[in-house]
């Protein structure tokens, strides 16, 4: 069965920590992005990890030249267990992050195809090549969309790597459409459906139970 990853895209530190406290028994990892980190600072990652003792992934979708990617990785992986990067910038930029991560025993997760409708314009046409590149570079995992189950399946088969898949919940992705594609090494990302709900704890529990079927 795949694991559950919470996308914690809130802006307020206290609210973020309250949600983490509420859901920590039902999520396997937490993903933080620019909204929370730009609002509160990178140390929020350390606070979250201390509170829940779960893997915390920095979803910064790093997409710069190798020298800049290296600097971003060094700052981020001081606290985070892994970092998400874009692959379209090329092998050298991804390798720069991998070099930092390897020294710190941290993870690099590479985007192949995103979950929103606009991803079909430019990312989807190159997603298969990005999946091949991810396999070649032996990144730790890839990002592929739950909103397009057929693409999730194709990308996973090409890359032969663990997948973290966004889009379940608010974006319309359904767990029942992807469960047979995923295995115990994969993560399903749920964000707004949990953190915007009246009861994040109950929603997290519900999604965890759905994954355990």
Curated annotation (Swiss-Prot):
What are the GO MF terms of this UniProt record?
orotidine-5'-phosphate decarboxylase activity
Which residues are annotated as active site?
61 (proton donor)
Keywords from UniProt, A to Z, are: Decarboxylase, Lyase, Pyrimidine biosynthesis
Return one Gene Ontology term, BP aspect: 'de novo' pyrimidine nucleobase biosynthetic process
EC code: 4.1.1.23
Q: In which pathway does it act?
A: Pyrimidine metabolism; UMP biosynthesis via de novo pathway; UMP from orotate: step 2/2
Give start-end ranges for the coiled-coil region(s): none
> What Pfam families does its record include?
OMPdecase (PF00215)
Task: Name the Gene3D superfamilies on file.
Answer: Aldolase class I
UniProt xrefs under PANTHER family: OROTIDINE 5'-PHOSPHATE DECARBOXYLASE
Its annotated function is as follows:
Catalyzes the decarboxylation of orotidine 5'-monophosphate (OMP) to uridine 5'-monophosphate (UMP).
**UniProt family annotation:** Belongs to the OMP decarboxylase family. Type 1 subfamily.
What is this protein's record name? Orotidine 5'-phosphate decarboxylase
Species in which this protein is naturally found: Methanocaldococcus jannaschii (strain ATCC 43067 / DSM 2661 / JAL-1 / JCM 10045 / NBRC 100440) (Methanococcus jannaschii)
Upper classification of the organism: Archaea, Methanobacteriati, Methanobacteriota, Methanomada group, Methanococci
This protein's gene is called pyrF
